[in-house]
């Protein structure tokens, strides 16, 4: 855990870490010395010259004051380090996530990222002071007391150090017993959280399927798994706690027994023996503190591991190049591109060149690789081999900001943020001129929606755009994409779930866009591609036909068959007679 935490400390604060370590060690030594000073203090107080106790009291007072000053400075430095870790972690995760390879975002990793982001709050800022400082103090103080006791009585000091070894051995063993179960419990907790979120978001479908009872859904399975993991965790923790408690009793008996033996033999006076009772309490207190900190320690270790997992997530290749013709519609070239999802080959040697400013439609059956082509152009994925070029520049060598600025995307399932309709359009270009925003909304026919909405473009659309219909959300996403001054526009199945009116609105918006762009449209419904200059028909990861719509229809190949199937499907209606 400490190694992970040190990796999160900013470079400019590494010197402060050394200062913090020195102050923490000094604090431990001062507390150990203060505890052991009670022995000569009481010995002097019960001696023939009790006035000698003033000297030892003075030393005890000085050590106590020095400890207060040290602890105050340690706390200040600890908070400074904690806030530095918090700030760096927040910035690093914010910088990392937009560049992480999309293949990393599995359900488990997505849950890890969500929990890591949620953890970057006040608890991370207070980690050093509230957990690390007490933990280091509790771990070192018994050993420091044992070393200090060597100067009073070597056998007593050795007994104390032996007790430290026994207690830390028991603590390590109990931690090992529970760590594996704790990992499983953490995984099942994450899975249960994801299922609860899924259960809440899919209520409409679940109610329609009469599966609203959690026990009949995957929530029930996740809950059962969480319950079982929790029981296993408790089962593994109890033996560890018993073992640690027994070790504490052994250390107590060993230390107290040594003190009694030395007193009986006359090697230790009665006043010193009485003082040792107080020292014994100070000796055992840290172990109780460690036991109390153990759950927080495991939780913090898991949190830091999640944060580190996000920061270690694989990122897309990034270069420093930029497009030479900024703002001009670029050419797009695929040069023998291959891509796979695991063992499944999606694109197998795809090559083509799209002319600047043209509109190209990519058509083909489901699973043929159409959306993957768009992802590669957008830089969301990287080819396993081959190259994707914009104006002759390999996408992988582009600066990440230049790559993102070059492409605007309309997704099949658009996501709107919990803000106003206008705010969601402005995501495309937050600094856009108001006239440009109005023009983009007019092109996407968002202006037709404003009269029906309670607050016009100031209407709050809700998380995910739940206040709008699917077609309305798609229009807003089109306006957002058109507002972005990107020279490449990618459209992925934007009309697949829309009615005829909304489909016409989307197609008209894409056609009427006056900005010079190279457009690539993926579509199943062929009405969406009627204005395309060129069609690529993709099947089984290969481009099997390439040409203008009329040429491909006349050729009578796969595109013509696909077109005929679409035409037949569009004419089907309930009550149609089979021929």
From Swiss-Prot:
Transmembrane intervals: 26-46, 49-69, 127-147, 148-168, 242-262, 273-293
GO cellular component, one term: plasma membrane
Compartment(s) of residence: Cell inner membrane
Regulation (activators, inhibitors): The ATPase activity of IrtAB is stimulated more than 38-fold in the presence of Fe-MBT, and more than 10-fold in the presence of Fe-cMBT.
Subunit structure, interactors included: Forms a heterodimer with IrtA.
Role played: Part of the ABC transporter complex IrtAB involved in the import of iron-bound mycobactin (Fe-MBT) and carboxymycobactin (Fe-cMBT). Has a preference for Fe-MBT over Fe-cMBT. Transmembrane domains (TMD) form a pore in the membrane and the ATP-binding domain (NBD) is responsible for energy generation.
Name of the protein in its database record: Mycobactin import ATP-binding/permease protein IrtB
């Amino acid at each position: 855990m400490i190694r992970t935490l040190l990796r999160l400390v900013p470079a400019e604060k590494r010197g402060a870490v050394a200062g913090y370590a020195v102050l923490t060690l000094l604090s431990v030594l001062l507390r150990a010395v203060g505890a052991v000073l009670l022995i000569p203090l009481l010995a002097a107080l019960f001696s023939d010259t009790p006035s000698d106790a003033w000297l030892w009291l003075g030393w005890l007072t000085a050590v106590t004051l020095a400890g207060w000053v040290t602890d105050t400075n340690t706390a200040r430095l600890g908070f400074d380090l904690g806030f530095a870790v918090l700030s760096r972690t927040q910035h690093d995760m914010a910088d990392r996530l937009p560049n992480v390879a999309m293949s990393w975002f599995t359900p488990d990793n997505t849950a890890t990222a969500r929990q890591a982001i949620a953890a970057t709050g006040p608890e991370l800022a207070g980690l050093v002071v509230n957990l690390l400082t007490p933990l280091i103090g509790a771990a070192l103080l018994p050993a420091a007391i044992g070393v200090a006791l060597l100067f009073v009585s070597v056998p007593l000091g050795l007994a104390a150090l032996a007790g430290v070894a026994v207690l830390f051995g028991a603590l390590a063993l109990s931690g090992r017993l529970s760590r594996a179960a704790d990992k499983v419990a953490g995984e099942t907790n994450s899975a249960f959280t994801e299922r609860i979120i899924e259960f809440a978001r899919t209520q409409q479908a679940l109610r329609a399927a009469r599966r609203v009872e959690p026990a009949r859904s995957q929530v029930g399975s996740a809950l059962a798994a969480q319950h079982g993991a929790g029981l296993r965790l408790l089962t593994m923790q109890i033996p560890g706690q018993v073992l640690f408690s027994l070790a504490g009793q052994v250390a107590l008996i060993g230390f107290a027994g040594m003190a009694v033996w030395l007193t009986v033999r006359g090697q230790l006076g009665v006043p010193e023996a009485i003082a040792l009772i107080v020292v014994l309490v100070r000796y055992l207190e840290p172990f109780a503190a460690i036991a109390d900190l153990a759950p927080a320690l495991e939780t913090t270790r898991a949190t830091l591991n999640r944060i580190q997992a996000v920061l270690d997530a694989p990122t897309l290749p990034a270069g420093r190049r930029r497009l030479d013709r900024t703002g001009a519609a670029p050419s797009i070239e695929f040069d023998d591109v291959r891509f796979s999802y695991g063992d499944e080959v999606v694109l197998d040697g795809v090559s083509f060149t799209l002319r600047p400013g043209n509109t190209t439609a990519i058509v083909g059956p489901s699973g043929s690789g159409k959306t993957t082509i768009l992802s590669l152009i957008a830089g969301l994925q990287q080819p396993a081999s081959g190259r994707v070029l914009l104006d002759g520049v390999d996408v992988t060598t582009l600066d990440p900001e230049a790559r993102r600025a070059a492409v605007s995307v309309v997704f099949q399932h658009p996501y709107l943020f919990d803000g106003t309709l206008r705010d969601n359009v402005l995501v495309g270009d937050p600094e856009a001129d108001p006239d440009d925003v109005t023009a983009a909304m007019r092109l996407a026919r968002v202006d037709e929606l404003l009269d029906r909405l309670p607050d016009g473009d100031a209407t709050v659309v809700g998380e995910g755009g739940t206040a709008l219909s699917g077609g309305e959300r798609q229009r807003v996403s089109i306006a957002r994409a058109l507002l972005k001054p990107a020279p490449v526009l990618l459209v992925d199945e934007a009309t697949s779930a829309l009615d005829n009116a909304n489909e016409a609105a989307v197609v008209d918006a894409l056609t009427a866009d006056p900005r010079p762009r190279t457009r690539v449209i993926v579509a199943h419904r062929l009405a969406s591609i009627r204005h395309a200059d060129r069609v690529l028909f993709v099947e089984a990861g290969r481009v099997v036909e390439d040409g203008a719509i009329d040429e491909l229809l006349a050729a009578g190949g796969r595109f013509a068959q696909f077109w005929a199937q679409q035409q037949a499907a569009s004419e089907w209606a309930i009550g149609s007679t089979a021929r």
